[in-house]
Amino acid sequence: MKTFVAKPETVKRDWYIVDAEGKTLGRIATEIAARLRGKHKAEYTPHVDTGDYIIVVNAEKVHVTGKKFTDKMYHAHSGFPGGIKSISFDKLIQRKPEMVIEAAVKGMLPKGPLGRAMFRKLKVYAGAEHAHAAQQPQVLDI
């Protein structure tokens, strides 16, 4: 019996919607990352993008434990000397709430072209409205 290897053109991708309201950031991010990779499917193949599309709504209402709301920092560097910029979680959740979930999930995906392709299937929205009603997403309870 030969080992099954999924082909990119034969992979069936579904659309799922996740409500992040009141959910813990890390717990929701791990499940989203696993779904984006396709690890929940029987035809999972490590070098093929077999994951589904994930829509996350209410990103502004995500929850963190402990003192992370004030103490957690996000860093970015411009590439120039002294070009590091830091922003705390509470300021980032006010300014760009989508970025909080995107950063958490992106760190859990593979680095490289395959990981970037998986990350493109993640759609995050700050409020309850999203632009993917035509795809008829199924509710994913995490």
Curated annotation (Swiss-Prot):
UniProt record similarity statement: Belongs to the universal ribosomal protein uL13 family.
Pfam families with a match to the protein in the record: Ribosomal_L13
GO MF entry, a single one: structural constituent of ribosome
Protein source organism: Aeromonas hydrophila subsp. hydrophila (strain ATCC 7966 / DSM 30187 / BCRC 13018 / CCUG 14551 / JCM 1027 / KCTC 2358 / NCIMB 9240 / NCTC 8049)
Gene (name only): rplM
CDD domains: Ribosomal_L13
Assembly and binders: Part of the 50S ribosomal subunit.
HAMAP family according to UniProt: Ribosomal_uL13
InterPro entries: Ribosomal_uL13, Ribosomal_uL13_bac-type, Ribosomal_uL13_CS, Ribosomal_uL13_sf
Keyword Ribosomal protein annotated: yes
Gene Ontology CC annotation, any one: cytosolic large ribosomal subunit
GO-annotated biological processes: negative regulation of translation; translation
Protein name in the entry: Large ribosomal subunit protein uL13
PROSITE patterns associated with the record: RIBOSOMAL_L13
Job of this protein: This protein is one of the early assembly proteins of the 50S ribosomal subunit, although it is not seen to bind rRNA by itself. It is important during the early stages of 50S assembly.
UniProt superkingdom: Bacteria
Keywords, comma-separated and alphabetical: Ribonucleoprotein, Ribosomal protein
